[in-house]
Amino acid sequence: MNSLLKVAVVCLVMLVACFVPRVILTDDADTEYNSDYLLPKRAGCKCADGRQETYYFMGCQGGWYRCSPHYVIGDCCKKFSGKYGTFAVRF
């Protein structure tokens, strides 16, 4: 009976561990992570020119523009950063 209880406790701990969302710590992620694009950013997105850019779940933030119409939910965003048309990639 005692071993059955130990097995049940181990199974319960494993079950809880599988369903608890992963916590992103500051040393595990860069300082630009926020809740708008935390998960999709890990997967990445590509703009029309094929370059990988930042994905925002709730639309592009200020100073950024949508560069790919292929996402049903959220936007693949690119930031304009110069008078000669160069773009900054935000990773």
Curated annotation (Swiss-Prot):
Keywords assigned by UniProt, alphabetized: Disulfide bond, Neurotoxin, Signal, Toxin
Signal peptide: 1-26
Superkingdom of this protein's organism: Eukaryota
GO terms for MF: toxin activity
SS bond list: 45-76, 47-67, 60-77
Entry comment describing in which tissues the protein is expressed: Expressed in ectodermal gland cells.
Task of the protein: Has toxic effects on zebrafish larvae. It causes contractile paralysis and twitching of the tail within 20 minutes, followed by death within 30 minutes. Does not show any toxicity when injected into arthropods (cherry shrimps or grass shrimps).
Additional information: Negative results: does not show activity on all voltage-gated potassium and sodium channels.
Protein name, per record: N.vectensis toxin 8
Species of the source: Nematostella vectensis
